[in-house]
């Protein structure tokens, strides 16, 4: 988490710290998935996906573009990009779309904006997720 640019603004990290989860107790069973940096404004790091489906629903219901979907079942379930090539660059998603801004864990990141909020000023740096007024 400390090296992730979503650190301090990640809901999963905030909940894990609240529950005092500090080390992994089980072997990770997820395969190493590629990073998609094909889009001019966005990067997808599929390895961070927790399968919450927020981007899938936002893309379908709010943006009406159906850019994302989940594929597979059980442990093979994973996020995919709905394009012929499977690359984000071959979709009509923009950085302003709801789907590009809804990810709670940093799967979808904006290029040229990394680490824009300094340490100490991030969402969960001063108040825990439990203390936040606007948590969902």
Description of each model-found segment:
Residues 117-122:
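Hydrophobic targeting/anchoring helices
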Residues 1-102, 106-110, 114, 125-136:
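Ferredoxin-type iron-sulfur electron-transfer modules and their immediate structural context
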């Amino acid at each position: 988490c400390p090296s992730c640019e979503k650190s301090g603004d990640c809901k999963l990290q905030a909940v894990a710290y609240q529950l005092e989860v500090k080390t992994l107790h089980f072997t990770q069973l997820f395969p190493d998935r590629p990073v998609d940096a094909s889009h001019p404004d966005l990067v997808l790091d599929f390895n961070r996906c927790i399968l919450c489906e927020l981007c899938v629903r936002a893309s379908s219901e709010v943006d009406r573009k159906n850019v994302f979907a989940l594929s597979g079942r059980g442990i093979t379930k994973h996020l995919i990009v709905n394009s012929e090539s499977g690359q984000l660059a071959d979709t009509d998603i923009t950085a302003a779309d709801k789907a590009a801004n809804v990810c709670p864990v940093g799967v979808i990141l904006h290029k040229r904006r990394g680490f824009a909020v300094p340490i100490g000023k991030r969402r969960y740096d001063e108040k825990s997720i439990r203390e936040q007024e606007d948590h969902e």
